Amino acid sequence: GNPDLHMISPHPTKRGVLFASTGYGRLDGVAEMIEGNAGVFRSQDFGNNWDYVWSGVTPRYSRPMCIDSRDPFSLTVASAPTAFSSFKDEGGAQAMLFRSDNEGQDWRSLCDEKHSPSAANFHGLTVDPDEIGGVLVGTDTGEVWSVSKEATWTLVAEGMPAVLSIFAGEEALSEKVKSVT
């Protein structure tokens, strides 16, 4: 079909291995909200063929995604029930954050008690340069969080508009978030 492609990320060391995060949108409407129609896909042949690697993970709608260039090459993906999930919804966005250390074969939640699921939706997502397996995540409530590989959440910044993207430089420890938009 014509998938709702959000992001494509190459594996840092395996030539031809790609990961894609997708949603339910289609050129001809909206796909049925079932497993296989949204989530994460992996290609091992430069994108010629794709395998669904998001089986059993909910919510399925996946958008922000990043992969750590350091071993074990953690792939982190944020997901929500729909493209329109928001902190303004009754019950909040119901967003989740997942990580795989084996190219999407297995996934584990990076959410703590407060974020399982999260009332805020996750839009900005990048690798934390200060911690292998850690990420920085931006929310639709104007917050940026540092999330460790052990799923410990630390508030880095707040009081901003919705954080749609994050750039963290190599020397980010002294000034954790270099650019937030």
Language-model features and meaning:
Residues 1-181:
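Extracellular glycan-interacting surfaces
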